[in-house]
Amino acid sequence: MNYPQLPVCRRPKVAILATGDELVFPGSTPGHGQIVYSNGYALHALARSEGAETIDLGIAADTLGSTAAGIRRARESGADILVTTGGASVGDHDLVQQALRDEGIAMAFWKIAMRPGKPMMHGRLGAMRVIGLPGNPVSSYVCAFLFMVPLIRALSGRSEIHHRHERAVLGKDVGANDMRADYLRARLEERDDGALVAIPVNHQDSSLLANLAAAQALLVRAPFAPRAEAGTPCEVLRLPA
């Protein structure tokens, strides 16, 4: 005690921009081809749980002008991190990458060998870091957990920024994996001998938000991992409670 000065870090500012004409806010009635917007609420909660301040940029329409306007608002707000959700793939309405390039992004990568979350991107617009997340709810959250959270921790000055891998055993058989790292949503149980058991949820579709909500962890499967039977050792990452 009795230190005249202490090193401190400012809380990072995270701006969150959703994209897509198909999105409507909760409480609205979805029209044909529309869905209720959920990603932003999960991302705001996740960022705040790590000590960040968040800025809600709303939903950009599927036009370059609307998407670019949202990106510029993020820069004007002084955000340290811009997180976009949706529009990160290569369809006619996936305009985030083009809007970011038009604004001058230095792209670090686009597309990663993991499931869920292949069409993720990352780069920098000046001092602002940019993370472009997929639009599917599970993909968006898993990528934010794996990439946004460590970035927030690093900008907060923490020495421990990565998620801790825990040892467990499989609670049921899992099939062989392909060339992508797989992050299976799983429930956790504890055996009488104290061993942690990871039980993958039955359906791993990246649109099934309820199955993510029921999971306590991500079961990590390496690329080309062979088929594994129940009782095989494995590694998990605990999700926020």
Regions found by a protein language model. Name each.
Residues 19-20, 82-96, 134:
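Glycine-rich beta-strand-to-loop/alpha-helix junction loops that act as flexible
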Residues 25-26, 90-94, 141:
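Short glycine/serine/threonine-rich phosphate/pyrophosphate-binding segments
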Residues 32-36, 59-60, 85-89, 110-112, ...:
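Glycine- and other small-residue-rich loops at beta-strand/loop junctions that grip anionic moieties
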Residues 14, 41-48, 68, 72, ...:
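Predominant activation on well-ordered alpha-helical scaffold segments within soluble catalytic domains
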Residues 99-241:
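Flexible glycine/proline-rich
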